[in-house]
Amino acid sequence: MEKSYVKFETPEDVSQKALDLVESSYRTGKVKKGTNEVIKSIERGESKLVVIAEDVNPPEVVYYLPSLCEDKKVPYVYVKKKADLGSKVGIASAASVSIVDYGKNEELYKSIVSALEQIKK
């Protein structure tokens, strides 16, 4: 069943790159996990990339994140499972994660943003 908050299909390779970026950014301590922290980072202009799980239940938990990201011009990407996203930030599951600082991974970040621009055209 397709979730109403999923606005586009993210190719598997882009999702995997996003998970890799989340994991490496987590090691530097520059990620926010959990919807409330993610919202704060977006509203404060700190977020560089938001990663949202597609299997969040109830969907209302993350329903407004894509619209908020678009309003604040923050790129966002989807991954299939919240368990996969959570494992990259040291918890069982995460509905959403905000990358505040991608550290030395600028090339990976740019490749994700570039791919997202192509998908949304």
Curated annotation (Swiss-Prot):
GO terms for molecular function: ribonuclease P activity; rRNA binding; structural constituent of ribosome. Keywords: Cytoplasm, Ribonucleoprotein, Ribosomal protein, RNA-binding, rRNA-binding, tRNA processing. One of its GO terms (biological process) is tRNA 5'-leader removal. It is found in: Cytoplasm. Gene3D superfamilies: 3.30.1330.30. Pfam families: Ribosomal_L7Ae. Its main location: cytoplasm. Transmembrane segments: none annotated. InterPro entries: eL8/uL1-like, Ribosomal_eL30-like_sf, Ribosomal_eL8-like_CS, Ribosomal_eL8/eL30/eS12/Gad45, Ribosomal_eL8/Nhp2, Ribosomal_eL8_arc. Multifunctional RNA-binding protein that recognizes the K-turn motif in ribosomal RNA, the RNA component of RNase P, box H/ACA, box C/D and box C'/D' sRNAs. Belongs to the eukaryotic ribosomal protein eL8 family. HAMAP family: Ribosomal_eL8. PANTHER family: RIBOSOMAL PROTEIN L7AE FAMILY MEMBER. This is Large ribosomal subunit protein eL8.
